[in-house]
Design a protein with these regions (language model features):
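Divalent-metal coordination cores built from histidine and acidic residues
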Residues: 2-12, 89-194, 260, 503-507
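Divalent metal-coordination and catalytic microenvironments
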Residues: 26, 46, 64, 75, ...
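Active-site mouth loops of central-metabolism enzymes
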Residues: 73-84, 139-151, 218
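Active-site beta-loop-alpha junctions enriched in small/polar residues
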Residues: 77-79, 105-107, 135-140, 170-173, ...
Length: 579
């Protein structure tokens, strides 16, 4: 900073020089002292210079409305919104989110460093601050088949990027606590760069948790009960309280929303569908829900602002105070947390739920050919769906409502006319398949899914964490083939086939994960698909696509299905579907 600039800022902060903008007669939410102050907020050149009594070149009388720091999502995968950067910004910025920390491991699993470069490029000029954690597990484990492999040497150059804050969720806790040298090299590189390491270790406890934290892992977003969260807090980790579309843990973790725990806990969404962003909101939704549950509003705000900024080392961010960046939101109602205006570096960027100057997606498709042409597989044939195992019993991967966890159920092998072998819609058991789509290997994993609810037809998705192969669930092989091939033809996306007809589809041509359209356009097609699926049995407690997308992730207990077959996550081995 130049000497003259610093002098001018000091004079303005003293009140000797008028500020560029003053938000007058505000109720300022103070996240340092957990109180609300009656004051003006003085802003110059994107920086807050004073909280007190000020005059300005421009003055806006807030008439007692609340001024709050801009909201920060400390852990999200933008790709899970199915939106590219500009469309994602349009969905979250009007809700008061001024910064996100994203882990682009979805697109990196498909396209490697080309995917990471795409995300950096398409978010660099947004009003929304988009920070990155480098994907640590591509693929998630050795028991997976991704489109790319990212080792330490591929990640190392990215630590020089100013928007890269560290190493993202270390999902392979099994390998970490067993001192796998490939994982340890990534940890060493991140630590040498002075950056953060996020965790992902559901149920890790005792000595293994000690080992995980010793390795350098500083946070966790997978806690589903307060006992687990408390143990991790005691061992020095930050807790990311997750409230997303598929995984919703806030209610279970409400005891953390008070001192002394709240100073080490932040709010995150992890994965959020476009409709939930547009209609319910983003971090503002979690704060509203917390307040409605009896949480002190200022505590909830602190967990969605100051705490993530302190954790990630985002200096001079996350508070309404002198010297802090003027990323602010104006609330007309604190209890309802109604966002009226959003300021980014002192400039009004959104008002009454709309961005004032939305950005457009501008990208060189030739440069990112690997991102826009990510399907490398042959057409699906009925023969690929034939079970090669025989036996009298079958193993079912059972979904848990509002959770990413699954359970195991063993039932007698089902045989019913009109459905595929192993399917029993009366018991909510459907057939499940995962087709490798990156290397034309022809690998197909087959299994059975419980509690999904589908009564007829088939659902296909190229969003299938984390390797994003093609996952298909259905009651009969013919519709499974049709739904899967529809997604393949579209170079990615979602599809529902019924009685030999495609009932609905949503193309996602960006790595098979994201659309180039607006949030509203994506949501309209997605809602049409979901309505059709609910009409054919999908439970109200299940998000038809996001829940299905996690069935293939072999790092969250108990059972998953990928291109190798059914994975017992705890044992890290393949187990038979029929035996």
């Amino acid at each position: 900073m130049k000497m003259e600039t610093l002098k001018q800022q000091i004079l303005t902060a003293k009140g000797d020089v008028r500020a560029e903008l003053v938000l007058k007669n505000a109720r300022v939410i103070n996240v340092f002292t957990n109180e609300i102050e009656q004051a003006d907020v003085a802003i110059c050149q994107g920086i807050i210079l004073g909280v007190g009594h000020y005059t300005g070149e421009t003055e806006l009388d807030l008439q007692g409305k609340y001024v709050c720091p801009g909201l920060v999502d400390g852990h999200i995968h933008i790709e899970s919104s199915m939106l590219c950067g500009p469309a994602f910004e349009q969905a979250v910025l009007p809700h008061g989110t001024t910064a996100v920390v994203t882990d682009p491991h979805e697109i990196s699993n498909v396209a490697g460093t080309a995917g990471l470069d795409f995300m950096l490029e398409t978010t660099k000029d947004l009003a929304l601050s988009v920070y990155f954690m480098l994907p640590s597990c591509v693929p998630a484990t050795g028991l997976d088949e991704s489109g790319a492999v990212l080792e330490a040497e591929q990640l190392r150059p990215y630590y020089q990027q100013p928007r890269v804050l560290g190493l993202a969720e270390l999902m392979n806790s099994y390998g970490t606590v067993r001192a796998d040298e490939k994982i340890l090299q990534k940890i060493r590189d991140c630590t040498a760069a002075g950056k953060k390491i996020d965790g992902h270790a559901p149920f890790l406890s005792g000595e293994e948790l000690n080992a995980y934290v010793t390795a350098g892992v500083q946070s966790d977003h997978e806690c589903s009960d307060v006992r687990e969260a408390m143990e991790k807090l005691r061992r020095g980790q930050y807790i990311m309280v997750r409230e997303g579309t598929a995984a919703q843990n806030m209610d279970s973790l409400l005891p953390l929303f008070r001192e002394p725990y709240c100073s080490r806990c932040m709010l995150v969404t992890d994965d959020k569908h476009p409709g939930d962003l547009l209609q319910g909101g983003h971090i503002d939704y979690i704060i509203r829900k917390a307040i409605a549950a009896g949480v002190d509003p200022v505590v909830a705000v602190r967990m969605g602002t100051l705490v993530p900024c302190q954790y990630f080392g985002l200096a001079h961010s996350g508070a309404v105070a002198p010297g802090y960046t003027a990323d602010l939101i104006v609330l007309s109602d604190l209890e309802k947390f109604t966002v009226e205006q959003v300021y980014k570096k002192g400039k009004l960027v959104a008002q009454q739920g709309k961005m004032l100057h939305p950005a457009a997606l501008a990208v060189d498709k030739a440069r990112f050919a690997r991102v826009f042409d990510s399907f490398n597989m042959d057409e699906i044939t009925p023969e690929q769906l034939q079970l090669k195992q025989t036996g009298t019993r079958q193993r079912v991967i059972c979904l848990t409502p509002h959770s990413l966890l699954t359970t195991e159920k063993i039932v007698p092998f089902c045989q019913h006319p009109g459905t595929a072998p192993g399917v029993d819609v009366t018991q909510q058991i459907v057939k499940l398949a995962v087709f490798e789509r990156h290397h034309r290997s022809g690998h197909v994993g087959l299994g059975f899914l419980g509690n999904y609810g589908l009564q007829c037809g088939a659902v296909a998705s190229s969003i299938a964490h984390d390797s994003h192969n093609l996952i298909v669930a259905g009651t009969n092989d013919a519709d499974m083939v049709l739904a899967g091939n529809t997604v393949r033809k579209n170079k990615g996306g979602l599809a529902f086939a019924l009685n030999g007809q495609v009932v609905g589809e949503l193309p996602l041509p960006v790595a098979g994960l994201m659309s180039t359209e607006s949030a509203e356009a994506v949501e309209e097609k997605l809602q049409a698909l979901k309505a059709a699926l609910k009409a054919h049995g999908i439970s109200e407690d299940i998000d038809a696509f996001m829940t299905l997308a996690f069935v293939s992730l072999p790092v969250i207990p108990k059972l998953r299905l990928n291109t190798y077959g059914i994975v017992d996550v705890d044992a890290q081995r393949i187990v038979p579907a029929v035996f």
